[in-house]
Amino acid sequence: MLAPPEVAALPDRLTFKPLGIDTWQEHVIYMHPDCAICRAEGFTAQARVEVRIGLRSLIATLNLVGSGLLEMCEVSLSVSAVETLMARPGDIVTVSHAPALESLRAVRAKIYGAHLDTHQLASVVGDIAKERYADVHIAAFLSACAGGRMSVKETIDLTQAMVDSGECLEWDREIVADKHCVGGLPGNRTSPIVVAIAAAAGLLLPKTSSRAITSPAGTADTMETLTRVALSATELRRVVDRVGASLAWGGALSLSPADDVLIRVERALDVDSDAQLAASILSKKIAAGSTHVLIDVPVGPTAKVRSLQDLERLRMLLERVARSFGVRVTIVRTDGSQPVGRGIGPALEARDVLAVLQRSPAAPFDLRERSLLLAATLLEFCGAVEQGAGLEMATGVLDSGAAWRKFEEICEAQGGLRVPGEAIFRRDVVAEQDGIVTEIDNRHLARIAKLAGAPMRQVAGVEMHVRLHDQVKAGRPLFTIHAQASGELEYSVAYALMHPAVSIAPT
């Protein structure tokens, strides 16, 4: 049977036209609703389609564009899809229905409370790693697994599936150390300092870090203001072989790649459940070849972990999952009642790190002391020093300048050390009355920093001027908001005024 004349007359050859639409790593294709392919295939908005250019292909979400942006024979792609397909203007594009995803059955089952087996979790994670899921599917999976709905067995299987989704590194050392913080505490940028101290003391630390999930900066975000962090596996090995440590972004490596996809959606949801947190941390460490991992868990009323009961539940989960993979972990409880250091946001936190490593008199004392505590614990845990002697060794390494020299070596090996930038716009938030600081809300401060543009805008964030129990006078700056755009500054300031992050009691 012949096609209707109006359809037959339409061109059935699709070419790529760049529009520069950034969907933050979600693959999207844009087509005219009246093009021959859309009509013939019955495509509707939000359909999942397979897009092919030459030998490269991916699964994308379809958006229909009825305006004059696209001719009927043209398609466009989101920036991430362009990069994956290496698309160039005029390339011939083939679009067809995406294969049905059998693993979505497991996601639906989990939504209704089912326990998933090893095969089901491997299937879900495999499809996520291959970018076959839309963000809405990933969000459904994350939500279904949150709120204590994952058993220990499921968490172990999830971790294994995430490890299996990528490559694994091996090292010819009996002890391979690592350090991680569960997050939730603004400014707690101890990892670069701990890595520098421990590596200068002789430990091997192939440290890979994630970007921020629910916070205004992750270690990778902060380090990116100082040096190159997107290293390949070959480059990472070269850096570690040369200087004994790295401070790289795990997302640039194929180590638990499913985790990086999950983190992107977790950031949008502002959700980080115990099971997902454990699987995320440990899958990366296992894939990196770590044997001994120190995990910093800040506990406080507005931190991610809010009570000793929550801490104990997380500790047991982390230890049980790690044990099943033959990895040793030690959990260190730290104070989560207020931010650490002065800066909140990538560049501001980087300045704090540099101040501590360079032994500046103005360096944040709390960041220095916490870093020394964690470094000392890691040195003792790995047997680099006798029990009880770690703090003396860590302090000596830092105060002698050896840690700073090691940090310089790491940065130079990764591409060179640079100076963090500064924000164009700043605004003080001041005390409205005389009194004493009785509470600092970590979550409000994190939200203020994120509204100012962090971590996407590296120089954005919050600079703290007070700590708990400080005496303040009316009009004294409590913190300064840094932003790179005036609109983001005003948005952040408005939130800060409506949601006070610093509580002051009159004296």
Swiss-Prot record:
Alphabetized GO MF terms: 1,4-alpha-oligoglucan phosphorylase activity; thymidine phosphorylase activity
Keyword Cell membrane: no
Annotated keywords: Glycosyltransferase, Transferase
SUPFAM superfamilies: Nucleoside phosphorylase/phosphoribosyltransferase catalytic domain, Nucleoside phosphorylase/phosphoribosyltransferase N-terminal domain, Pyrimidine nucleoside phosphorylase C-terminal domain
Any GO CC annotation of this UniProt entry: cytosol
InterPro entries per the UniProt record, alphabetical: Glycosyl_Trfase_fam3, Glycosyl_Trfase_fam3_N_dom, Glycosyl_Trfase_fam3_N_dom_sf, Nuc_phospho_transferase, PYNP-like_C_sf, PYNP_C, Pyrmidine_PPase_CS, Thym_Pase_Put
Catalysed reaction equations from the record: thymidine + phosphate = 2-deoxy-alpha-D-ribose 1-phosphate + thymine
Enzyme category, top tier: transferase
Protein name, as recorded: Putative thymidine phosphorylase
Keyword flag Transferase: yes
One Pfam family per UniProt: PYNP_C
Similarity-based family: Belongs to the thymidine/pyrimidine-nucleoside phosphorylase family. Type 2 subfamily.
UniProt EC number: 2.4.2.4
Biological processes per GO annotation: pyrimidine nucleobase metabolic process; pyrimidine nucleoside metabolic process
